[in-house]
Amino acid sequence: MHELTVNGVQIAFERQQGTSTPPLVLIHGFPLDHSSWDALLPHLEGADVLLPDLRGCGESAVVDGAYTIADMAEDVIALLDALKIEKAAIVGHSMGGYVALEIARKVPGRVSGLGLVSTQALPDTPERKAGRYATAEKVGDQGSDVVAASMAPKLSADPQHVSALRELIQRQPAAGMMGALAAMAERPDSTDLLSTFKFPVVIVHGLADGLIPVERSREMKALIPQASLTEIPDVGHMPMLDAPTETAKALKDGLLSS
């Protein structure tokens, strides 16, 4: 892992060097880290790929106090600045999709294309927001294990993948998990943003996703004329893990020029 202090936060990241353009930034979801993309990397051979750990996740620093999805986006933008990456294709999975949308809101001129994997533009409903805060309270009392036990089985139908995901979630800092839950609960509605995109947009969603229904991706596609939508049968919330070939093809075809 590499580490840089950007936007006042120590951010850890991996870099797969490649010759294809533009660079591809893969932003992980909750409650994971950059390694959630590992199964996809062999299918992106030759691509220049940047994989950050968001603040409070993986090897990145845990930040005291409340923060927002916009703060997470600023971290990634600052990392691009530090690495002298002027323009990149930004891909986000689930919570990472919220961060990717915020990057597109803040610096659209630096986004060559956008990938939205198992995510949505809508904000939390009041019920979902309350549920996130209740989960954060449980994490504060019981640690990361409580989320690992409940969420890992919802991420994949493959027992081996579920076991590995449970271990990955257990490794995540409880404080960072609580911060991310609050940030997601307070994220804005990005629906009106979608029609402003002038760059290519690739949307990928598993038809068996039990966390964010595929209808959310279909709604986004309807608002982005140039967007492609790849729906993958029998795949849940993590198509990059359960269907890496199809996911990589969609991203390469839509976002990489060479």
What residues fall within each predicted segment?
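Alpha/beta-hydrolase fold catalytic core
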Residues: 1-24, 45-48, 85-86, 171, ...
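Catalytic histidine neighborhood in serine/cysteine hydrolases
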Residues: 214, 218-237
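Conserved hydrolase catalytic core segment
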Residues: 83-125
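Conserved alpha/beta-hydrolase catalytic His-Asp/Glu region
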Residues: 124-130, 141-196
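Conserved acidic catalytic loop of the alpha/beta-hydrolase fold
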Residues: 70-88
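Short beta-strand/loop motif that positions the catalytic acidic residue
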Residues: 197, 203-205, 209
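Catalytic histidine-centered segment of alpha/beta-hydrolase-like enzymes
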Residues: 235-248
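Conserved HGGG/HGGXW glycine-rich cap/lid loop of the alpha/beta-hydrolase fold
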Residues: 7-65, 69, 79
